Amino acid sequence: MVKIRIKTGDKVQVITGKDKGKRGIVIKVLASLSRVIVKGINLARKHVKANKNDVSGGIINKELPIHISNVAYVDSSSNLITKITYTKLDDKRKVRVSKRSGEILQ
């Protein structure tokens, strides 16, 4: 199992696959599957049948999960992809840190 260092709300860039080079915000992290769902990336057309709650059926675009190894975190200060590491602060809190800029991530 891959260690998950990317969190919901992070800006990431796809580094391999059909959407290589595209950037988006992580909507959901599926830790048990080592996958993430990124807004606007890996879209698939799904046919939806009309039901009582949603009268209109039809074809919708839906984001499908991408493996965590196929995305990289985008550093907000340099706007380049970077790796993430964990560091303990003086008050014993464990925080995520950008390796490129050394900036503490939220």
From Swiss-Prot:
Keywords attached to this entry: Ribonucleoprotein, Ribosomal protein, RNA-binding, rRNA-binding
Quaternary organization: Part of the 50S ribosomal subunit.
Family annotation (SMART domains): KOW
Biological-process GO terms, alphabetical: translation
Family matches, as NCBIfam families: rplX_bact
PANTHER family assigned to the protein according to its UniProt record, in alphabetical order: MITOCHONDRIAL RIBOSOMAL PROTEIN L24 (PTHR12903)
Organism per entry: Orientia tsutsugamushi (strain Boryong)
CDD domains listed in its UniProt record: KOW_RPL26
Cellular-component GO terms for this entry: ribonucleoprotein complex; ribosome
Domain of life: Bacteria
S-S pairs: none
Family classification: Belongs to the universal ribosomal protein uL24 family.
GO molecular function, one term: rRNA binding
Xref: HAMAP family: Ribosomal_uL24_B
UniProt protein name: Large ribosomal subunit protein uL24
Gene designation per UniProt: rplX
Reported function: One of two assembly initiator proteins, it binds directly to the 5'-end of the 23S rRNA, where it nucleates assembly of the 50S subunit.
